[in-house]
Swiss-Prot record:
Matching PANTHER family: CENTROMERE PROTEIN S, CORTISTATIN
Entry protein name: Inner kinetochore subunit MHF1
GO molecular function terms listed in the Swiss-Prot or TrEMBL record: chromatin binding; DNA binding; protein heterodimerization activity
Native source organism of the sequence: Saccharomyces cerevisiae (strain ATCC 204508 / S288c) (Baker's yeast)
GO cellular component: FANCM-MHF complex
Recorded family membership: Belongs to the TAF9 family. CENP-S/MHF1 subfamily.
A biological-process GO annotation: replication fork processing
CDD domains: HFD_CENP-S (cd22919)
Task performed by this protein: dsDNA-binding component of a FANCM-MHF complex involved in DNA damage repair and genome maintenance. FANCM-MHF promotes gene conversion at blocked replication forks, probably by reversal of the stalled fork. Component of the kinetochore, a multiprotein complex that assembles on centromeric DNA and attaches chromosomes to spindle microtubules, mediating chromosome segregation and sister chromatid segregation during meiosis and mitosis. Component of the inner kinetochore constitutive centromere-associated network (CCAN), which serves as a structural platform for outer kinetochore assembly.
UniProt entry keywords in alphabetical sequence: DNA damage, DNA repair, DNA-binding
Length: 90
């Protein structure tokens, strides 16, 4: 697979997860959404995950490692204690 195929496959999987989450969150509400809305959320999530990956790689490199580990994630989540707690519990 090339990068474009990988990206398309990742976005397809992310689309499914975004739509599933919307269904979970909005199941009790009378709110409708369009495929265009799902696509907007997908693109936002994709960009955010890309930025997160870059930050995690930078943290690992700064620590002299070539591999991202949990300490990098905890540093990334340093301003989000609720998420840090969830990561620590798992």
């Amino acid at each position: 697979m090339n990068d474009d195929e990988d990206r398309a496959q990742l976005k397809a999987r992310l689309w499914i997860r975004v739509e599933e989450r919307l269904q979970q969150v909005l199941s009790s509400e009378d709110i409708k959404y369009t495929p265009r809305f799902i696509n907007s959320l997908l693109e936002l999530a994709y960009l955010q995950l890309g930025e997160m990956g870059s930050d995690l790689q930078a943290f690992a490199r700064h620590a002299g490692r070539g591999v991202v580990n949990k300490s990098d994630l905890m540093l990334y989540l340093r301003k989000q204690p609720d998420l840090q707690e969830r990561v620590t519990q798992e």
